[in-house]
């Protein structure tokens, strides 16, 4: 869990925050803003509620408020590689001449191979990408089950993000199905505003997801520094988010954890949706009964535990839009109070917003899901045709031809300036991991390995000669 020691804006910084607001009237009663007033409560422990799936209730992360500057950024690196060992320090200095072997899914039928894998020997599988193919550079994030690293693929020098998750922690939390679903869902997605999975594999102790490295920072990070977004900028960001969520729904996937921390920005300023740890595949006219998400962005039907469908994502999009336009979510307080407000309280819309912004927020933030914008037969088209999006050319937008007016400072593919120094200064050495069950049949992560096909296979066209 992220430490609760957060940099709190002082009075001068608060005044700077207020000065960029389009109207002083909306904030005149909030001159002495506290950090939690702007971004919601500090992290709390998730409570466990009995549902048909393990309850996963996140609190907001406040880890992206203090990046290193571009001027002081240094790319002086120690050559490191990834190593899986019985002692389970999986990131160690690479010793010259040392040979590493790769352990792919130990789910084969050969008992001798399974025994070797369980004894700590790593079995090399020809043509499959594994830990020995990557050189670690920096820590760029941390989650419930492990860390996220900036890595370089040795063969091509391409830069990626590698999400490393400890199996023992996953099993302790009973989250194996979530992790498998994340991997499976990522293999089915191909969209200009969604981070792509490039490779996945596993070793005895850990799971590995290798994804696009997006280094423009988080939407949350830019929102913190700008205070709030102008409507024209928020419109482009929201349109890109709507496009991404619409693609997921067309694929039969709910994201279920849409929030600024899960929306990255690329070097051109486009949004990139990430983190599918709570995503779920669904069938039309069916509901999920799990209690999951991040409290501030949960739809009322999730809080009530009455079952939810893809309409819950559109509520979260509405909360995101509200936060972009006003600087903070509509409901603040302790986790319990926020949940009560989500179910009972009306949302107050600031007067400085346009009538069109009021209309789309009211549509997305309907407490009854069947009345919510995007829940009708036309789905996302209902949102895309809303008058607030008048002027958005959706074909050009999805071709990445509509450029946001803000472009983050990025000095190159390796730049980590938009990541918090609390991560990038962190040691790349990981903590020990307990050994999983010695029974190969108990491994729930079979068929985890994946290599994304080249674009020519994903978008293959036939040519007549």
Curated annotation (Swiss-Prot):
The keyword Phosphoprotein is assigned to this record: yes
Broad class of where this protein is predominantly found: cytoplasm
Keywords on record: ATP-binding, Cytoplasm, Kinase, Nucleotide-binding, Nucleus, Phosphoprotein, Serine/threonine-protein kinase, Transferase
Domain AGC-kinase C-terminal: residue ranges: 390-460
Phosphoserine found at: 290
Coiled-coil regions listed: none
Post-translational modification: Undergoes serine-specific autophosphorylation. Phosphorylated at Thr-449 by TOR.
Main function: Downstream effector of TOR signaling pathway involved in osmotic stress response. Could be involved in the control of plant growth and development. Phosphorylates the ribosomal proteins P14, P16 and S6. Functions as a repressor of cell proliferation and required for maintenance of chromosome stability and ploidy levels through the RBR1-E2F pathway. Mediates the phosphorylation of MRFs (e.g. MRF1).
Note in the entry: Plants overexpressing KPK1 are hypersensitive to osmotic stress.
Protein name: Serine/threonine-protein kinase AtPK1/AtPK6
Designated gene of the protein: ATPK1
């Amino acid at each position: 869990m992220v430490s609760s020691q957060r940099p709190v804006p002082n009075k001068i910084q608060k005044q700077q925050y207020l000065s960029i607001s389009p109207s002083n009237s909306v904030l005149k009663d909030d001159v002495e803003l506290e950090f939690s007033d702007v971004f919601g409560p500090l992290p709390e422990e998730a409570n466990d509620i009995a549902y048909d799936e393990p309850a996963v209730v996140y609190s907001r992360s406040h880890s992206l408020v203090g990046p290193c500057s571009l001027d002081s950024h240094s790319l002086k690196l120690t050559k490191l590689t990834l190593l899986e060992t019985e002692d389970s320090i999986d990131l160690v200095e690479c010793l010259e001449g040392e040979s590493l072997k790769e352990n792919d899914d130990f789910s084969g039928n050969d008992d001798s191979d399974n025994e070797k894998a369980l004894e700590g020997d790593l079995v090399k599988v020809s043509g499959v990408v594994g830990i020995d193919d990557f050189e670690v550079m920096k820590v760029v994030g941390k989650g419930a089950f492990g860390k996220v690293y900036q890595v370089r693929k040795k063969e091509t020098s391409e830069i990626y993000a590698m999400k490393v998750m400890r199996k023992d922690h996953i099993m302790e939390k009973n989250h194996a199905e979530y992790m498998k679903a994340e991997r499976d869902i990522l293999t089915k997605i191909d969209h200009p505003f969604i981070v792509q999975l490039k490779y996945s594999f596993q070793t005895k102790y850990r799971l590995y997801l290798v994804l696009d490295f997006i280094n423009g920072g988080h939407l949350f990070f830019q929102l913190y520094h700008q205070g709030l977004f102008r409507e024209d900028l928020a419109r482009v960001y929201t349109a890109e988010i709507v496009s991404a969520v619409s693609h997921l729904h067309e694929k039969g996937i709910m994201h279920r954890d849409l929030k600024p921390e899960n929306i990255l920005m690329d070097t051109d300023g486009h949004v990139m949706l990430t983190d599918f740890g709570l995503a779920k595949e669904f069938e039309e006219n069916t509901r999920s009964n799990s209690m999951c998400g991040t409290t501030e962005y949960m739809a009322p039907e999730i809080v009530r535990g009455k079952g939810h469908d893809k309409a819950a994502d559109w509520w979260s999009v509405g909360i995101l839009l509200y936060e972009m336009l006003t600087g903070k979510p509509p409901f603040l307080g302790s986790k319990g109070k926020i949940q009560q407000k989500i179910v009972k309280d009306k949302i107050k819309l600031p007067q400085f917003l346009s009538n069109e912004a009021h209309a789309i927020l009211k549509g997305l933030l309907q407490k009854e899901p069947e009345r919510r914008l995007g829940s009708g037969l036309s789905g996302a088209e209902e949102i895309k045709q809303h008058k607030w999006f008048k002027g958005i050319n959706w074909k050009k937008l999805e071709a990445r031809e509509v450029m946001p007016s803000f472009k983050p400072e990025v000095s190159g593919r390796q730049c980590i300036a938009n990541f918090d120094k609390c991560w990038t200064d962190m040691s790349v050495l990981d903590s020990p991991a307990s050994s999983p069950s010695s029974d190969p049949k108990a491994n729930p992560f079979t068929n985890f390995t994946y290599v994304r096909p080249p674009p020519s296979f994903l978008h293959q066209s036939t040519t007549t000669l």
